[in-house]
C-alpha cells in the first residue's frame, strides 16, 4: 500500500504576496479599457466586506459583462504582465520564496489555495514551481471568457471543500499537512490540517493562533 504523504498548502494574497493580486489585475483590465474606471468605486465596499467577513454569495454570484467574449490568451498574457509588474515592484515576499524553495528541497508537495483567480495566479505558481493551484476559475468556452465563474469561488468554506477534494483525489495525508495563511477567513481550512501556520496574520488570526498555540511566521 502506497504511503500517504502530507502537503504544504499556501494562501497567496498577503501570505506570499504583499498585494491583492486580483486588484492589480483589475487595474490592468481598466488600463486596457476592458473595464470602465467607474468600477473602482465599488472596490472599497468589497474590500471592507471581505475584511470583516461579510462577503456573501451575492458578491460572488455575478456576471461580468465586460469579460464576455474576451480571449483567454489575452487574459493569460495580462496575467503574465501583472506578475512581471509585481516582481518589478517587489510584491512577492522574498522570505516566502526562500521558505517554499526550502520545502521543495525536502521533496515537499507545494499547493497554492487562494480565492483569487487561477488565470491571475498561474504565472506566480510557475515562478514558485508549485505542484498544484486550487483557486477560483473563470468559465471559458472555445477560448472565450463567459463572463462568470466556473462553480463557486474558493473563499472560506468553499476553499476548504476544494482543498479537501484535491487532498482526497491525490491521496494526501491531512494530518501531516501544513496550511499557511494571513487571514481568519481561512479558519475552516486551518482546522483541517495537522500543522496550521499563521503568516503575517491579521489581528483576529493572531489572537486565534495564540489561543491554539499555532506557529506565527513573518514573511518580508
Language-model features and meaning:
Residues 1-53:
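Active-site neighborhood of HAD-like aspartate-dependent phosphohydrolases
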Residues 2-5, 77, 84, 88-220:
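C-terminal cap/substrate-recognition subdomain and adjoining C-terminal extension
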Residues 10, 25, 83, 179-180:
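Aromatic side chains
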Residues 22-23, 48-102, 106-108:
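Short linear elements at protein peripheries
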Residues 31-36, 55, 70-76, 154-157:
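General structural signal for secondary-structure boundaries
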Residues 42-57, 75, 122-125, 137-139:
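Short N-terminal helix-initiation segments at or just after the protein's N-terminus
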Amino acid at each position: 500500500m502506497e504511503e500517504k504523504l502530507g502537503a504544504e498548502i499556501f494562501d497567496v494574497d498577503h501570505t506570499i504576496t504583499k498585494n491583492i493580486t486580483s486588484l492589480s489585475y483589475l487595474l490592468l483590465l481598466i488600463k486596457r479599457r476592458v473595464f470602465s474606471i467607474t468600477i473602482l468605486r465599488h472596490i472599497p465596499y468589497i474590500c471592507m466586506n471581505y475584511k470583516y467577513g461579510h462577503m456573501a454569495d451575492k458578491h460572488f454570484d455575478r456576471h461580468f459583462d465586460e469579460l464576455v467574449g474576451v480571449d483567454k490568451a489575452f487574459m493569460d498574457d495580462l496575467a503574465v504582465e501583472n506578475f512581471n509588474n509585481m516582481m518589478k515592484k517587489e510584491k512577492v515576499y522574498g522570505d516566502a520564496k526562500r521558505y517554499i524553495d526550502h520545502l521543495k528541497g525536502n521533496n515537499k508537495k507545494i499547493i497554492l489555495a487562494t480565492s483569487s483567480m487561477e488565470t491571475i495566479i498561474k504565472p506566480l505558481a510557475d515562478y514558485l514551481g508549485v505542484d498544484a493551484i486550487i483557486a477560483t476559475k473563470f468559465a471559458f468556452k472555445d477560448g472565450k471568457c463567459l463572463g462568470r465563474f466556473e462553480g463557486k469561488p474558493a473563499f472560506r468554506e468553499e476553499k476548504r471543500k476544494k482543498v479537501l477534494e484535491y487532498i482526497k483525489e491525490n491521496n494526501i495525508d491531512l494530518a501531516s499537512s501544513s496550511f499557511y495563511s494571513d487571514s481568519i477567513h481561512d479558519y475552516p481550512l486551518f482546522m483541517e490540517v495537522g500543522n496550521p501556520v499563521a503568516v503575517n496574520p491579521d489581528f483576529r488570526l493572531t489572537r486565534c493562533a495564540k489561543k491554539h498555540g499555532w506557529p506565527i511566521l513573518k514573511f518580508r
